């Protein structure tokens, strides 16, 4: 059942009542109001839990700091006082950054059209002011993508196109794109139609020495491939990934950027994460190889083993491109299996690295007996079982390890005994008992290992009907 909601005014009135009628102190009054509403099942996540303040001139009704900043901004815009507009934009932005509730309250009180007016005023006269307006809009739309309208969308694309050489404006504009597209499929589709994809890939190329721009552009490109909006039956994630690769040379752009940032683990993590989102077709996986991407990934896995997040993203990218059977063999020939096993062993305490390592090895072993032999001889099965022991409560690790073991032996029964001798059966049975999600994969692994498996009929016929 959906949580109950109240307005900011209702909460403020309750706090004021506690102070005036029950003579409570400020903190006690707020705490009492919070407890009162939460006991009634009210969601207060979008409520500012402070006392409204009196304005500096004392002429206005007490209001929250973010709304005071918004009112002052609107007044300065009415008089086109650019210096004051600049100061109030900074102040408003600082208030919105403090908490989600402040952004929500500002949006409820008409902040978006006011920022749009500041944006339009700055676009024709002042790049410094334009940057401040864009920054404020990026903060306001964080978690509130519904605010974007058609006017703002076209203004955003035009701003990116007209200021492509400006590093700060490009970075801030792309951050706006990311915020308004996250969990909003219609905004994604509309921005793609308006031509945002070539602007994103061009930003990586044009600002290839600026880590912040590359990081933001990668993040925005990934968001374009998300299917995270529960309000639509299906999205265009696959189509957007195809457009990024085929029409905008996305893979080439990312791989060239990886070469340029070879000593920056943070940027490399973003690039690898984006690469894995774009490897959605067989030919795209092969293109990564043709562009020299495999060598970069394997080298990163070997040379950057100390950077856990980068290791995780490289493993994810290897897993993605290994969907192509020819690429599987290329990864094995390049020494990828040894590097994956080494990464899992090095980061055995990390469930995320263990899960991604098992998943990557699982894909490499699928339908490939020769690859299975290389993995087992390189200690892959042992490492996977060690990961299962280290993370018994992590369903993802248990599931991927079971799938890996199944793939290792499904076409190479000769490997069953060595894996069983390592204690695989007991670990798989434990995973099956502890995690319902592992039921099918655990059963498949036990079956292909030659262990006794109790099979249960899911459906039985009864006088022409199916019954569970």
Curated annotation (Swiss-Prot):
The keyword Phosphoprotein is annotated on this UniProt entry: yes
Q: At which residues are the ARM repeats?
A: 195-239, 249-293, 294-336, 337-379
For the modification Pros-methylhistidine, which residues carry it?
A: 238
Identify the keywords attached in UniProt to this record, alphabetized: Methylation, Phosphoprotein, Repeat
PROSITE patterns per the record? ARM_REPEAT (PS50176)
- Does the keyword section mention Nucleotide-binding? no
Q: Which residues carry this modification: Phosphoserine?
A: 39
What does the entry report about post-translational modification of this chain? Methylated at His-238 by METTL9.
Q: Name one GO cellular component term.
A: cytosol
What is any one GO biological process for this UniProt entry?
hematopoietic progenitor cell differentiation
Family from the record = Belongs to the ARMC6 family.
| Protein name per UniProt | Armadillo repeat-containing protein 6
Which organism's genome codes for this protein? Mus musculus (Mouse)
